[in-house]
């Protein structure tokens, strides 16, 4: 078998799963198939939500609801009750004794 000249495909051949899209007419047409109104040469933006309603805070429209501030606090647990805890307590007592001695 020659890779540059394969044998013909037996059968009707592969078909596409969907029919092709029809071609859209080109020209000065509006989004609904009619020419745009006078003084409005461009169609409105396609992604605008709720056509006819202003966004939050625009021209007296509804105000955006207040946002709630959330603070995340992590509780630190120290389960290493050992030499470091004892050392911290000793240093605290020594400092307190030194301060007491200086003040009296």
Swiss-Prot record:
Region entry Disordered, spans: 1-47
Q: State the annotated membrane topology for this chain.
A: Single-pass membrane protein
Point to the regions of Pro residues compositional bias.
Answer: 1-25, 33-47
Q: Entry's InterPro entries?
A: CYSTM1-like
**GO CC annotations, alphabetized:** membrane
Cellular location(s):
Membrane
Q: Which family does it belong to?
A: Belongs to the CYSTM1 family.
Q: What is this protein called?
A: Cysteine-rich and transmembrane domain-containing protein 1
Q: Which organism is it from?
A: Mus musculus (Mouse)
């Amino acid at each position: 078998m020659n890779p540059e000249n394969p044998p013909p495909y037996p059968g009707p051949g592969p078909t596409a799963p969907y029919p092709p899209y029809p071609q859209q007419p080109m020209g000065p047409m509006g989004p609904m198939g009619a020419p745009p109104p006078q003084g409005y040469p461009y169609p409105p933006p396609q992604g605008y939500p709720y056509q006819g309603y202003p966004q939050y805070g625009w021209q007296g429209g509804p105000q955006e609801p207040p946002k709630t501030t959330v603070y995340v606090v992590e509780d630190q647990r120290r389960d290493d009750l050992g030499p470091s805890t004892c050392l911290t307590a000793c240093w605290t007592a020594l400092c307190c004794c030194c301060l007491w001695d200086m003040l009296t």
